[in-house]
Amino acid sequence: MEDLLDQVVVELHRARSCLSDPLVFTQAAVIGSILFVFLLGLYNYFLHPIAHIKGPFLAAVTPISLIRALRDIHNPGPDNHHYTKRGTSEDLILRFVFGANNILLVDEGEDHKRLRGALQPAFTAKAMRDQQDITHYHVQKTVERLLEAAMDPSQTISLTKELNKLVWGNVGNLAFGEPATLEQLENHEKAKDLHAQIAPILEFFQYLNGNPILGRAARGLVGISRKVFGLSGNILGKDQLRRHIASQQGQKNFLTAILGAKESSGLSFDEIHSNMLLLLMGGYDSSAASLSAIFYHLLREPQQYKRLQSELHHAYSSVNDITCNSLLSQPMLNACINESLRLVPPFNGHGSHRVTTSGTMIDGVWVPAGTLISADFYSLHRDPSCWAFPDEYRPERWLKEHQGPGTPFENDVKTAWRPFSLGPRVCVGREMALQSIRLAVSKIVYTFDMTLANRDFVWDRDAGSHYMWHDFDIAVTLAKA
């Protein structure tokens, strides 16, 4: 027995001496890692509690999802169950920017109800009517800048940059009673670029989020990173918010509406800051990306642009006659907007939406407790079981004359159109965003003939998306219509 123990000690010493050699240690680490990943993959594919939910092989055996399958249900990770069925959409939530609870970061329940109740007064029908003049002002300023550019029809301009300025100024004005500065816009764009660069890490952290220990560590790292980069302070600092609050007497905007609900909703200052930051960033990103995408699709299909322009010229004798309320009854305008929002939903991606607390049956599939459930807007909007010609820009699918029996779109499932999410998670500012988008698109199309200058740009291929769209720029030449 003693000889055996001596032999074991000798072998352990030999192993330690071998591992002290960097080359041997590296080889052992690599071989051990490969073996671990292989065995983990076997477990995930054959023995994991949701192994019966089939999907792309790589997604089923590892948390690294490199394959997108446009199917009703697929398994994008060994602990994840991803749905594209209507009725299960929910927003991807990241804590990389926001330091306190806001309407997107809290689970549904009393906290979510409390925060939603605090924001709701900012988006009532009366609030929207009160804010129309502000949006008209910013759209008109953009039209005036474009008229100057149109004096040289050979000049190529970035329509995206002009639309970004429009939306940023408008959202800031709606939120605080004064336009947000271009410096804030630059800081926001830098933050968005940073988010795009580290998005794969955040996606992996979301996978870890399902583990009680690793998830806590991942959330801690995200919180530390937020403080290191100081993103929120560069876009809307707390001192800056305090100055806005002090200057709100007699004004009507998002901030005054939220302040009016502060006591009844029990909002802390940090929660007010987080929600105002969300309204500024989310309101800008969703509307700015949507406007660029709308003009991209219209200009890729010039006959659709001309058709919309003709409808507007027929409906209004002057661009000054266009009003927010009258645009609700312009079928081609709303069809073009709806179709672009289908192909390019304002926010995209899937993430750690919720974890099942007990086993449940979803759409005929048994999902065990502890499974992360998520949905993907892009996949939902391109699902061939819900849409005819799912990857094509067909605004006519939204027109009444193309929706009856015998039409190509008779089986379209319009309830699968969820660019602003649904249920308790539906975007609280969706109607305000649509109001601004309709006004901007109608006045610009009414006033200008446009040609897409960078026709080699293909949105689906060239634009990036890590929840927020980025790396897109619609360049145009234009002349007064």
From Swiss-Prot:
Entry superkingdom: Eukaryota
Assigned GO CC terms: membrane
Positions annotated to bind heme: C427
UniProt similarity note: Belongs to the cytochrome P450 family.
Membrane topology, from the record: Single-pass membrane protein
Gene: dpfgJ
Record-level Gene Ontology MF annotations: heme binding; iron ion binding; monooxygenase activity; oxidoreductase activity, acting on paired donors, with incorporation or reduction of molecular oxygen
Species for this entry: Gibberella zeae (strain ATCC MYA-4620 / CBS 123657 / FGSC 9075 / NRRL 31084 / PH-1)
Residues bearing carbohydrate: N338
Enzyme category, top tier: oxidoreductase
Keyword Transmembrane helix in annotation: yes
Keyword presence, Iron: yes
Gene3D superfamilies: Cytochrome P450
Keywords assigned by UniProt, alphabetized: Glycoprotein, Heme, Iron, Membrane, Metal-binding, Monooxygenase, Oxidoreductase, Transmembrane, Transmembrane helix
Lineage: Eukaryota, Fungi, Dikarya, Ascomycota, Pezizomycotina
E.C. number: 1.-.-.-
Biotech / industrial applications: Diterpenoid pyrones display various biological activities and FDDP E shows anti-HIV activity. FDDP D and FDDP E show also inhibitory activity of 42-mer-amyloid beta aggregation that is involved in the pathogenesis of Alzheimer's disease.
Function description: Cytochrome P450 monooxygenase; part of the gene cluster that mediates the biosynthesis of diterpenoid pyrones. The first step of the pathway is the synthesis of the alpha-pyrone moiety by the polyketide synthase dpfgA via condensation of one acetyl-CoA starter unit with 3 malonyl-CoA units and 2 methylations. The alpha-pyrone is then combined with geranylgeranyl pyrophosphate (GGPP) formed by the GGPP synthase dpfgD through the action of the prenyltransferase dpfgC to yield a linear alpha-pyrone diterpenoid.
Biological process terms in GO annotation: terpenoid biosynthetic process
Principal cellular location given in the protein's record: membrane
Reported cofactor(s): heme
Subcellular location: Membrane
Biological pathway: Secondary metabolite biosynthesis; terpenoid biosynthesis
Name recorded for this polypeptide: Cytochrome P450 monooxygenase dpfgJ
